[in-house]
Structures are given as C-alpha cells and as structure tokens.
Amino acid sequence: MRGVVWAARRRAGQQWPRSPGPGPGPPPPPPLLLLLLLLLGGASAQYSSDLCSWKGSGLTREAHSKEVEQVYLRCSAGSVEWMYPTGALIVNLRPNTFSPAQNLTVCIKPFRDSSGANIYLEKTGELRLLVRDVRGEPGQVQCFSLEQGGLFVEATPQQDISRRTTGFQYELMSGQRGLDLHVLSAPCRPCSDTEVLLAICTSDFVVRGFIEDVTHVPEQQVSVIHLRVSRLHRQKSRVFQPAPEDSGHWLGHVTTLLQCGVRPGHGEFLFTGHVHFGEAQLGCAPRFSDFQKMYRKAEERGINPCEINME
C-alpha cells in the first residue's frame, strides 16, 4: 500500500548507512554520494497484507528508479521475498504483542536459492553484513537482538536479466528462547549446570535416549543426529515419532553445527533444544547420569527452576 510515506521520508533525511570498515568481505556498497542520490530519488512504504510476510518485485518500479523501500511487518514469524531486486529495502520487524526490544531476538534464514542482494544489520548508519549474495550457497541462520538494529537489503549489480529472488524466513522470540541459536553460532562448548537446568524448563523438546547415527552434511555445514528416544518428557511439532516396531520408543533427528564435531557416543543422554524454521536444533545434551547428579544436587538446595520426572 503506497501513500503512507511519512516514516520513509523521515528516513530519507538521514545519511545512508555506512559500509563496514576495512578488512576481508564483499565489495562495499556504492559511494556515499551515489547512495544519497538513491535516497533522494524516492522512498516508499509497503505494508504487508497479512502483517507477517511480504512479497514484491523490482519490475514494478520505473527502469531508472533506485528507490529505498520501507517494509513493515508485525508478527512473530514470516518471510520476505523480493523478485528482481533493484535499489534497497529497509525491513522493519516488530512483534504482534507488546515486548521491549531489548528482550527480543531476531533470527533469519535465507531461502536456499536466494540471490541478487546482500542483507545487512543496520543501526544509526552503520552496516554489518549478515548474508552475502553468493548464488548456490546454503543459507545459514543468523541471529541478533532487535535493539541492535533493523534489516537493510541492498540489490547487487547484475550483468543479465535472469530471474533472481532474494528471500528469507524470520522469527522473533524472547531473548532466552533465542539463546540456543546464539550458542550454536559461537564455538561449540558444553552447557554449564545452570544452562542445563534452565534448558529443561524452556526447551521445545526434552527427551532421554541414545544416538543411533550421525550424518555430516558439509554443503550445509550441519550434522544430523539420529536419535532413539526412550523417554519423551516434552516436545512440540512432533519432532519424534513412535518407532514402527511398536517398542515403546520414538525416533527422530536433530541438527547441530558441523564444526561441533558430533560423533556417535555410547550411553544415554538427555537431549534438549528448540524448533526453528521447522528444524529441531540441539541445545544442551548432557549424559543422563551427569544430569541426574546435577538435578538432585539442585533439588536438595532448592534451586532447580522447574521439575522433571527422573524415573
């Protein structure tokens, strides 16, 4: 819907975001003067019809137009799809419930074939690259605090007119629920006792079981861990399904970063984690015997944040 442009015009009065400092990375955005001309050339606001997802095309603009388009989405999850990208988008994400920005984490996952634009985190004129325009590379999940800034999507110069689409899914969640993805994006490390005890309260799934196999997928930089579950404490989205042999067990798989170097291990574990973008992602996974000790110790001291059946 065009016509509601006051917010965009306020933006147009600001300086264009500055490119990241020197160092390895993609070519910087065009010079400041050219970018200022882009802004002055026009800006428009777009409101999604369902407030969760937006789909647009650069072909709707005049050939010489280099607009900066404002997109406003007010939802906890959705997607952005931009066909034939030209110029730039500023994507404003807000939850559909009142929640302070400092308590919210935003995670984005590029579409598998996304191409035609770079995606930056932008705040007060500074740019930090999140997703580089490299066609054919699988998109990695990127997370940041909502108070760190918004999304600036800039089309890259193209030598042909073949169809290109830049797109991504997004999720907004409380800071605590987004913790697992931040842990996964950092060097892998075992969870502390406090993190494990909190994970059993806040995770989307909490199960007890064994690792049957691990499949490494280098092209996606992930490892898929196949589990046989003996005790289902909690799950969402039906990650684990009853085993076909009707043995009282459940089967399912979770993913973690390839760099974590997960290998099949003997013994029983407690697996926790969250479901993001339809995928179960591993959080804390202590050996069950170690978990029993830390849980009982916390229970004796009265500091366990929630209860779980240990039988």
Curated annotation (Swiss-Prot):
It is found in: Secreted. GO terms for cellular component: extracellular space. InterPro entries: Meteorin-like. Disulfide bonds join 52-75, 107-143, 188-260, 191-284, 201-306. Residues 1-45 form the signal peptide. GO terms for biological process: brown fat cell differentiation; energy homeostasis; fat cell differentiation; negative regulation of inflammatory response; positive regulation of brown fat cell differentiation; response to cold; response to muscle activity. Its main location: secreted. It comes from the Eukaryota. Glycans are attached at residue 103. GO terms for molecular function: hormone activity. Keywords: Disulfide bond, Glycoprotein, Hormone, Secreted, Signal. Abundantly expressed in adipose tissue. Belongs to the meteorin family. Hormone induced following exercise or cold exposure that promotes energy expenditure. Induced either in the skeletal muscle after exercise or in adipose tissue following cold exposure and is present in the circulation. Able to stimulate energy expenditure associated with the browning of the white fat depots and improves glucose tolerance. Does not promote an increase in a thermogenic gene program via direct action on adipocytes, but acts by stimulating several immune cell subtypes to enter the adipose tissue and activate their prothermogenic actions. This is Meteorin-like protein. It comes from Rattus norvegicus. The gene is Metrnl.
